[in-house]
């Protein structure tokens, strides 16, 4: 990972440790977990959270049970140093009732398969009355929708706008075949970093409005319908990341991206023209790992491995 990526991660996802990160949940639910080194429990059966403790909280993970939501309504605005909050998706319908502190930068929505029936039962309502519509936080720079286990996508039920998220720069979500949420994002002029999961369509024509602003682009778990056609228009890209791409990656397309500093390809199939990477003059970081061809052999042959490893770039890993 080069210095560019490190700065991005630190900006939107600051380090989590037990001194500043808490999970608002019940003691019973906490004890059911095997081990959690990153968070300190904040028992939602408590009737009071001291001002001193509120001041310590920088990252808060909220459970979906017990008194978590009522405690948030009472104490959230006192957590003046809070920069990151993780909310269960089931709380989206009443998120407008929470008194968010001004310093918060990162909003993570955790969607779990146990909410599938809830969103299915409310599909008609949430389609007509979108979640987060006419709501937002001025200082939010990162919006992250995380799907756990077999959770069904909820992006079609969400509506956000530049008016209510004027400083949004980093967005992560699952695309599949839906274009509604992606179309909303195209109205933003501030977005610099996109992470797209489960892409089942030709997504680049829909991303054209980002061609002059997008600096990093990540694709995760995209199947045979995914294509890179159109990526050449994103000439300001500095980092490109692929994880679990099953439709092949032609590295020649990277030659159309002159500012590329970082290329990451992992757990993907049928990587061709890998030698094109040798011509990227601004490359600072290269990570190639666990990529297979049609015969499930390593995509990187001995000749290309030698050439790539001989590149004079600061950070390189070929596995």
Predicted segment positions?
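Cullin-RING E3 adaptor/co-adaptor recruitment helices
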Residues: 1-38, 66
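Hydrophobic anchor residues at the C-terminal helix/turn of individual leucine-rich repeat
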Residues: 49-51, 76, 98-101, 134-137, ...
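A short, flexible N-terminal coil/short beta segment enriched in small residues
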Residues: 4, 9-13, 97, 207, ...
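Concave beta-strand-loop units of leucine-rich repeat
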Residues: 22-24, 35-47, 59-71, 81-94, ...
């Amino acid at each position: 990972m080069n210095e560019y990526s490190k700065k991005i991660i630190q900006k939107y996802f600051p380090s989590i440790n037990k001194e500043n990160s808490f999970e608002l949940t019940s003691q019973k639910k906490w004890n059911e977990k095997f081990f959690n080194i990153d968070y300190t429990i904040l028992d939602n059966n408590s009737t009071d959270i001291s001002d001193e403790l509120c001041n310590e909280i920088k990252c808060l993970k909220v459970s979906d049970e017990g008194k978590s939501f009522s405690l948030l309504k009472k104490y959230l605005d006192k957590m003046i140093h809070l920069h990151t909050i993780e909310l269960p998706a089931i709380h989206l319908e009443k998120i407008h009732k929470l008194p968010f502190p001004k310093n918060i930068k990162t909003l993570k929505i955790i969607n779990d398969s146990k909410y599938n029936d809830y969103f299915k039962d409310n599909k008609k309502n949430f389609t007509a009355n979108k979640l987060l519509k006419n709501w937002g936080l001025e200082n939010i720079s990162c919006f992250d929708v995380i799907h756990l286990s077999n959770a069904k996508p909820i992006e079609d039920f969400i509506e956000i706008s530049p008016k209510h998220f004027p400083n949004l720069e980093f967005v992560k979500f699952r695309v599949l075949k839906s274009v509604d949420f992606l179309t909303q994002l195209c109205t933003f002029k501030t977005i610099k970093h996109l992470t797209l999961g489960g892409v089942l369509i030709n997504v680049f024509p829909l991303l054209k409005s980002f061609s002059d602003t997008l600096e990093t682009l990540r694709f995760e778990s995209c199947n045979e319908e995914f294509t890179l056609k159109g990526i050449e228009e994103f000439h300001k890209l500095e980092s490109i990341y692929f994880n679990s791409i099953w439709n092949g990656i032609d590295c020649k397309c990277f030659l159309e991206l002159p500012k590329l500093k970082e290329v990451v390809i992992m757990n993907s199939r049928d990587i061709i023209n890998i030698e094109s990477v040798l011509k990227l003059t601004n490359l600072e970081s290269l990570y190639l790992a666990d990529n297979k061809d049609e015969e499930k052999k390593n995509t990187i042959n001995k000749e290309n491995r030698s050439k790539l490893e001989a590149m004079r770039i600061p950070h390189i890993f070929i596995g």
